[in-house]
């Protein structure tokens, strides 16, 4: 059965609706990135779905289309701030900043997952990146943005293979940590080895 990815956007059809998602909650290194997207219901880009279900090439293509056609914003919270305030609070902060940075003020903000926000505009949707087009679009922007950041950091610290693992705790990444120790970009609050 085909899921109507505009179901939630249609539910709030008289409102400006933003979708928000993050990338980088689980990695051992690098920032967490949140992106907010307001989809233009009169200009639907085909192929948008949860970033994890797309090839890198398709994500990059959709990134260009989304950023060229929709209102969007991104927020990045550093690994040091993640260590200072914890990953959940860092993610919430990134989400709030991304929404605040949009060129249009949304009346409803659809959020992937079950995070709770004090802002009453935020509506949490479990599995939202598979159920809402605007959340799926935000997942693509967040993932591509973070992957590009980790690619840049990988040039500085190639031994951790961030160009391949994006900072996640793969076997090779953990082996590199055991050999080389932690880089300045590793999250100290994450127990990895």
UniProtKB/Swiss-Prot annotation:
It is found in: Cytoplasm. A divalent metal cation binds at residues 21-22, 112. Residues 15-193 form the RNase H type-2 domain. It comes from the Bacteria. One of its GO terms (molecular function) is RNA-DNA hybrid ribonuclease activity. Its EC number is 3.1.26.4. Gene3D superfamilies: Ribonuclease H-like superfamily/Ribonuclease H. InterPro entries: RNase_HII, RNase_HII/HIII, RNase_HII/HIII_dom, RNaseH-like_sf, RNaseH_sf. GO terms for biological process: DNA replication, removal of RNA primer; mismatch repair. CDD domains: RNase_HII_bacteria_HII_like (cd07182). Keywords: Cytoplasm, Endonuclease, Hydrolase, Manganese, Metal-binding, Nuclease. Its main location: cytoplasm. It is an enzyme of class 3 (hydrolase). Its cofactor is Mn(2+); Mg(2+). Manganese or magnesium. Binds 1 divalent metal ion per monomer in the absence of substrate. May bind a second metal ion after substrate binding. GO terms for cellular component: cytoplasm; ribonuclease H2 complex. Belongs to the RNase HII family. HAMAP family: RNase_HII_B (MF_00052_B). Endonuclease that specifically degrades the RNA of RNA-DNA hybrids. This is Ribonuclease HII. It comes from Rickettsia rickettsii (strain Sheila Smith). The gene is rnhB.
């Amino acid at each position: 059965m085909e899921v109507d990815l505009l179901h939630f956007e249609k539910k709030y059809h008289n409102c400006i609706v933003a979708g928000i998602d993050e990338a980088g909650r689980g990695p051992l290194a690098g920032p967490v990135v949140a992106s907010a997207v307001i989809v233009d219901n009169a200009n639907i880009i085909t192929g948008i779905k949860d970033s994890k279900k797309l090839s890198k090439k398709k994500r990059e293509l959709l990134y260009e289309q989304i950023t060229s056609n929709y209102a969007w914003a991104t927020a990045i919270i550093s690994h040091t701030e993640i260590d200072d305030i914890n990953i959940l609070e860092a993610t919430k902060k990134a989400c709030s900043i991304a929404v605040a940075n949009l060129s249009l003020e949304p009346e409803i903000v659809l959020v992937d997952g079950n995070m709770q926000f004090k802002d009453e505009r935020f509506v949490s949707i479990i599995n939202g990146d598979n159920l809402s087009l605007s959340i799926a679009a935000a997942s693509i922007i967040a993932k591509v943005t973070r992957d590009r950041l980790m690619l840049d950091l990988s040039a500085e610290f190639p031994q951790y293979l961030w160009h391949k693992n994006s900072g996640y705790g793969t076997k090779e990444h953990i082996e590199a940590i055991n050999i080389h120790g932690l880089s300045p970009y590793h999250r100290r609050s994450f127990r990895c080895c």
